[in-house]
A protein has these predicted regions:
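Extended lipid/amphipathic-ligand handling interfaces
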Residues: 66-69, 90-92, 166-170
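Envelope-exposed proteins and targeting segments
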Residues: 45, 64, 73, 86, ...
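Gly/Pro-enriched, hydrophobic low-complexity segments
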Residues: 135-215
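An acidic-aromatic
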Residues: 74-124
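Bacterial Sec signal peptide processing site at the extreme N-terminus
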Residues: 20-40
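Post-signal-peptide N-terminal segment of Sec-exported extracytoplasmic proteins
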Residues: 42-76, 80, 87
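Sec-dependent bacterial lipoprotein signal peptides
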Residues: 1-24
Length: 215
């Protein structure tokens, strides 16, 4: 006589436990960083960031608040508080760049990085940060990009700079960097983004002007 084998049917509590274990085993998904193709689209051609930047070299350093706007290839960078100058403004496009100080001096050049270095004495890779802050290398230049096992951006190296990404923010279905560290030789630059804005900037931001020093 054959004894039928018992048939096991999991109860509702066992099913709930299985679902909970499955959820714990699956890490939360993070949106992909933008690609060079994404940034070339009209959807991402206008953007703005507000945040803070600091530079440290040896026992010297400075920090400033930052407001950076880009409109279809034209950019404007306002730095408030660097080097005791009150504020500086940098405006540029493919044709060149103009730097204005709080005391009314204007400087014009073809290269933004060289102009900032000549006026302030500090090396700030403006041309690179325009792309690195969006999580992509500068087009047309050799770069080494590192991602984690899930394909998320971890770091990139380009033009003598090493860029480490520590934090991202989901905006419009993409992961945009909000904390990054740039190093070259003995210089360290830290950039913290408090606000990412995609599309046309609000009028209040557009009217932010370089302020003159107090008498």
């Amino acid at each position: 006589m054959r004894i039928p084998s018992p048939h096991y049917s999991p109860g509702p509590y066992a099913l709930l436990l299985l679902l909970a274990l499955t959820a714990c085993a699956t890490p939360p998904a993070r949106e992909a960083s933008p690609t060079a193709l994404d940034l070339a689209s009209p959807r991402y051609s206008n953007w703005q960031i507000r945040g803070r930047v600091s530079l440290v070299k040896g026992d010297q350093g400075w920090h400033a608040s930052l407001n950076w706007r880009e409109d279809a290839g034209r950019y404007r960078l306002d730095l408030s508080g660097p080097l005791g100058q009150g504020a500086i403004r940098l405006e540029g496009d493919a044709a060149g760049v103009r730097l204005q100080t709080a005391d009314g001096h204007d400087y014009v050049a073809e290269d933004a990085d060289a102009l900032v270095l000549a006026v302030t004495g500090w090396q700030l890779p403006v041309a690179g940060i325009r792309y690195w802050v969006r999580g992509v290398p500068v087009p047309g230049r050799p770069a080494v990009v590192k991602t984690d096992a899930a394909g998320h951006l971890v770091s990139l190296a380009q033009s003598g700079w090493d860029i480490r990404y520590d934090r991202f923010q989901d905006v419009d279905g993409r992961a945009w960097p909000t904390r990054m560290r740039l190093t070259t030789d003995d210089l360290s630059v830290r950039l913290v983004v408090d606000d990412w804005i995609l599309g046309s900037a609000p009028a209040s931001a557009a009217s932010n002007a370089v302020s003159a020093p107090s008498p």
